[in-house]
Swiss-Prot record:
Keywords: Ribonucleoprotein, Ribosomal protein, RNA-binding, rRNA-binding, tRNA-binding. This is Small ribosomal subunit protein uS13. The lineage of its organism: Bacteria, Bacillati, Bacillota, Clostridia, Eubacteriales. The gene is rpsM. It comes from Clostridium beijerinckii (strain ATCC 51743 / NCIMB 8052). Disulfide bonds: none annotated. InterPro entries: Rbsml_uS13_C, Ribosomal_uS13, Ribosomal_uS13-like_H2TH, Ribosomal_uS13_bac-type, Ribosomal_uS13_CS. GO terms for cellular component: cytosol; small ribosomal subunit.
Length: 122
């Protein structure tokens, strides 16, 4: 079982796809990792030798921020924005979209379920 950065990679998938199970590694990053380490992207995770797994692990530890470190970094960045009172920080605090999307009709993912208000009698 290949275990990298505290994540068990799925055995039956190709290495290229298996690496994307690690938080902070997408498809393009996994392709770059495999190109640098010289491992065939079509190889299945179960077919990797221990030496190849160690190469991947070493490259990730030296060059990338993944999993807990990356999550902590993102959380600290958001916390900093909230503390300094920037526009983006205020949007985070209120639970609204941060990147300029309209909120009159959409933004249900960020705002949560619709809160209906009872109509006033005439």
């Amino acid at each position: 079982m290949a275990r990298i950065s505290g994540i068990d990679l799925p055995r039956e998938k190709r290495v290229e796809i298996g690496l994307t199970y690690i938080y902070g590694i997408g498809l393009s990053t996994s392709q770059k990792i495999l190109a640098v380490t010289g491992i065939n992207p079509d190889t299945r995770v179960k077919d990797l030798s221990e030496e190849e797994v160690n190469e991947i692990r070493t490259y990730i530890n030296k060059n990338l921020m993944v999993e807990g470190d990356l999550r902590r970094d993102v959380a600290l960045n958001i916390k900093r924005l909230v503390e300094i009172g920037s526009y983006r920080g205020i949007r985070h605090r209120r639970g609204l979209p941060v990147r300029g999307q309209k909120t009159k009709t959409n933004a249900r993912t960020r705002k949560g379920p619709k809160k209906t208000i009872a109509n006033k009698k005439k």
